[in-house]
Amino acid sequence: TYIDGNKGILLYRGYPIDQLAERGDFLESCYLLLYGELPTKQEKHDFDRCIMQHTMVHEQFARFFHGFRRDSHPMAVMVACLGAMSAFYHDSIDITDPQQRMIASVRLISKVPTLAAMAYKYSIGQAFVYPRNDLSYAANFLRMCFSVPCEGYNINSVLTRAMDRIFTLHADHEQNASTSTVRLAGSSGANPFACIAAGVACLWGPAHGGANEACLKMLQEIGSVERIPEFIARAKDKNDPFHLMGFGHRVYKNYDPRAKIMQKTCHEVLKELNIQDDPLLDIAMELEKIALNDEYFVEKKLYPNVDFYSGITLKALGFPTE
């Protein structure tokens, strides 16, 4: 992955992120990152089929979940589940074997959404939903999260596309904290599942993967559109420790290229769901307007970043902030 923070460029294996997110899908980006080239039509078909045939997890994982409290943080559950994968799939933990490394990669890509959906279902006391191999990657994940056994679940193409873009935009981001953690763990010869578990533990931090959660909590703290000027003034005050979450980026000194796509996606989702009376989303939209026009934000290039829009989009899709 290549990043030019000054020009606002993000490339996966030489391909601009906007092209991959708009014209392709997440599994196409996975293939690109794994093999270095975009797949042919047949290669894409075979890869998709391979991934979707590995979405089931060992049935004992259901019992594994019952060892957690219902209010456990989902990242704590994911760290444990990913580490446990090495106990369930010990035929793909030899990192010196290229074939085992590839099998581990396929298993991680295919099974992590299933485990994440199980973590969500467990937290709200609902029955686990098994994956369906005839659905797309993103549609499968949304169905596992939000369907219930007592009624049908309709696949919404706009929401599915939004989820797929979120996956694509977060697939890789150069040598960030979680990637560095995975590589450091891997340098000791640890198995792929343990390494990814370490990466997820790093991703848990509020300065990394927790940024969109922190952004939504900030919107909750603001509380109403009328209070926005007060918090804008605090953000401009050097002596006030308050920071506007979801604005600016440590790497991108220009507009975050992922944010442009996520902004469009966010508005597509809000329009599709006809969301007009959510106070948090009202605050977010007003903050967006101010940040794109206020001289202070424009001069300092504090544009809304990918976490700002992805947090709002995920909330609109139905995912709770926590």
Curated annotation (Swiss-Prot):
Active site: H249, D307
Gene3D superfamilies: Citrate Synthase, domain 1, Cytochrome P450-Terp, domain 2
Gene: gltA
Organism phylogeny: Bacteria, Pseudomonadati, Pseudomonadota, Alphaproteobacteria, Hyphomicrobiales
Molecular function in Gene Ontology: citrate (Si)-synthase activity
Name listed for the protein in its UniProt record: Citrate synthase
Family: Belongs to the citrate synthase family.
Classification via Pfam families: Citrate_synt (PF00285)
Organism per entry: Bartonella taylorii
Further remark: Citrate synthase is found in nearly all cells capable of oxidative metabolism.
Enzyme class, first EC level, given as a word: transferase
EC number(s) stated in the UniProt entry for this protein: 2.3.3.16
Keyword Coiled coil among record annotations: no
GO biological process: tricarboxylic acid cycle
Catalytic activity: oxaloacetate + acetyl-CoA + H2O = citrate + CoA + H(+)
Cysteine pairs bridged by disulfides in the record: none
GO-annotated cellular components: cytoplasm
